[in-house]
């Protein structure tokens, strides 16, 4: 058949099935993607991770694939019968950002839930999020829950699950919104295309929006906003890691970064690019395609803000092309006022990796010489205190190693390996502390790679002073 006469089923079989039904690649299956709406699937192919794989398809063909995979055009919504008021914001406990504060502790002091009564919890209501995955964590302000998913931010009543208001973005929301009481009755969000929004908290009306620096279509938001009463700190990631599956793609030029934005005006105060501009470093032997480095060092996690030392602190991902950079797989601290690098501590050198390393055919043209092991810092770095009240940064890596560091210079105080590690963790996300212990989730999910440890998935409590379990 000519391409324009192929059915949605044929187009899906020709373009999607080989990878999405291969369980070793860890992609969403066709059945899983069927949980999404047609609009969401189109967005994945036109502006998301699959844009490189779908660029040879016409708009009509993309729509056919989306329509074949999913029958859902849009999700239904139950609207509240009353308006949101300030009194709704004063009841209950708050969780105001991904890290529940600029130190990323992810700890709730004001709760009645404990190990004795958690078994008594019962489902009160449920709310169907768009799509097949939940990319961001909701935040809570009194009786209000703010949940961002795909192209919509929902303001929900915690008693009933109805929506007070919704705000739609032209692009997907992948990360948590943020709120700070001192900044007023406003909520802040950033979408996949790095457009940042300030919204009226009670009505969801737009106050301002700002386009953050986006050097490439591969740059996007993946870590959430960190906030104080005067500024936003926003991480910038890159998904160029998937592009080298194309044998003619010139890998790679993008970099992770951090942006600081004024809360009142939306003005960009500074932007810190992790890597220097990429340079030509050679050509692929098989295809003669050009190779560029340094690249990568994505910031997947939510940055912390240390107001005592005037620092922004965060972790980075792997390099995308060899030779690997000194700033990949590192914990970095920036000056809060200027965005200049204060210190950087790399925990693993020589880690250059992209998705081509996982696909046998693509490995010959797309995989960097160093070939991984892809040990990013995906979990947010935490600022806490030792038993002697000394400040400490706590970090966890996909390698399965946890670290305690000096906030002043990044010196490693202790390190402890709790898991096998892997391309999917290791310590991928989900660390928290009550300033007595560091709680760490360890994945150790199986992949095609072999490691020198047996998998030890689970949740671990570590001594903050020593890192001991």
Locate each region found by the language model.
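Extracytoplasmic electron-transfer domains, predominantly the class I c-type cytochrome c fold
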Residues: 18, 25-74
């Amino acid at each position: 058949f000519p391409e324009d006469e192929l059915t949605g089923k044929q187009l899906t079989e020709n373009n999607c099935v080989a990878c999405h039904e291969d369980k070793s690649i860890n992609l969403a299956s066709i059945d899983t993607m069927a949980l999404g709406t047609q609009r969401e699937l189109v967005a994945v192919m036109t502006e998301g991770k699959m844009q490189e794989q779908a660029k040879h398809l016409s708009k009509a063909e993309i729509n056919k694939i989306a329509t074949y995979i999913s029958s859902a055009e849009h999700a239904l919504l139950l609207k509240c019968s009353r308006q949101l008021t300030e009194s709704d914001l004063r009841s209950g406990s708050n969780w105001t950002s991904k890290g529940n504060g600029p130190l990323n502790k992810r700890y709730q002091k004001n709760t009645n839930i404990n190990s004795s009564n958690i078994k008594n919890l019962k489902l009160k209501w449920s709310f169907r999020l768009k799509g097949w995955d939940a990319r961001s964590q909701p935040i809570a302000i009194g009786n209000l829950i703010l949940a961002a998913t795909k192209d919509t931010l929902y303001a929900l009543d915690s008693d009933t699950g109805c929506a007070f208001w919704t705000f739609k973005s032209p692009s997907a929301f992948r990360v948590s919104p943020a709120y700070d009481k001192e900044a007023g009755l406003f909520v802040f969000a950033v979408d996949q295309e790095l457009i940042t929004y300030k919204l009226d908290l009670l009505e969801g009306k737009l106050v301002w929006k700002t386009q953050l620096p986006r050097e490439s279509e591969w740059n996007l938001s993946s870590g959430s906003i960190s906030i104080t009463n005067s500024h936003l700190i926003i991480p910038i990631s890159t998904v160029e890691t998937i592009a080298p599956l194309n044998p003619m793609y010139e890998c790679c030029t993008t970099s992770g970064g951090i942006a600081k934005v004024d809360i009142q005006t939306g003005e960009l105060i500074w932007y810190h690019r992790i890597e220097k501009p990429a340079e030509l470093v050679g050509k692929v032997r098989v295809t003669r395609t050009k190779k560029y480095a340094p690249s990568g060092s994505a910031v997947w996690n939510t940055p912390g803000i240390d107001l005592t030392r005037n620092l922004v602190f965060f972790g980075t991902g792997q390099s995308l092309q060899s030779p690997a950079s000194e700033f990949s797989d590192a914990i970095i601290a920036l000056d809060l006022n200027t965005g200049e690098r204060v210190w950087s501590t790399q925990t693993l050198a020589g880690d250059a990796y992209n998705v081509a390393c996982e696909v046998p055919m693509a490995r010959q043209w797309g995989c960097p010489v160093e070939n991984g092991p892809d040990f990013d810092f995906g979990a947010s770095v935490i600022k806490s205190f030792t038993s002697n009240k000394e400040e400490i940064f706590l970090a966890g890596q996909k390698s399965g190693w946890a670290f305690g560091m000096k906030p002043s210079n990044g010196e490693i105080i202790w390190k402890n390996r709790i898991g096998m590690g892997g391309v999917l963790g290791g310590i991928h996300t989900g660390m928290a502390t009550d300033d007595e212990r560091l709680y760490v989730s360890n994945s150790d999910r199986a992949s095609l790679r072999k490691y020198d440890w047996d998998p030890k998935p689970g949740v671990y409590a570590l001594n903050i002073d020593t890192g001991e379990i």
